[in-house]
Amino acid sequence: MVRIRLALYGTKKRPFYKMVVADSRFSRDGRFIEKLGHFNPVSKCQNSTLKLNLNRIEYWQGKGAQISKRSQKLIKLFNKKEDTV
């Protein structure tokens, strides 16, 4: 089963996440099929905190990929941010 989820990168006390498409059997930070965006929760600049490729997310949803709960929340947040701009 293919999932859209967050992979943890960064260093100690400085988390950085990549939103990726990966097989559910792969480890959290292991192999992935495609990178869809990134999320930096400790960024000082509001514009660079969250970047996503919505076209590719819709493509993978159409292929049957399941989205993790946290990824769904971030996609909704990104959509709100895009609507206000």
From Swiss-Prot:
Keyword Ribosomal protein: yes
Name the UniProt record assigns to this protein: Small ribosomal subunit protein bS16
Source organism per UniProt: Buchnera aphidicola subsp. Schizaphis graminum (strain Sg)
Gene for this chain: rpsP
Entry keywords, A to Z: Ribonucleoprotein, Ribosomal protein
InterPro entries per the UniProt record, alphabetical: Ribosomal_bS16, Ribosomal_bS16_dom_sf
Annotated GO biological process: translation
Family: Belongs to the bacterial ribosomal protein bS16 family.
Example of a GO cellular component annotation carried by this entry: cytoplasm
A GO term, aspect molecular function: structural constituent of ribosome
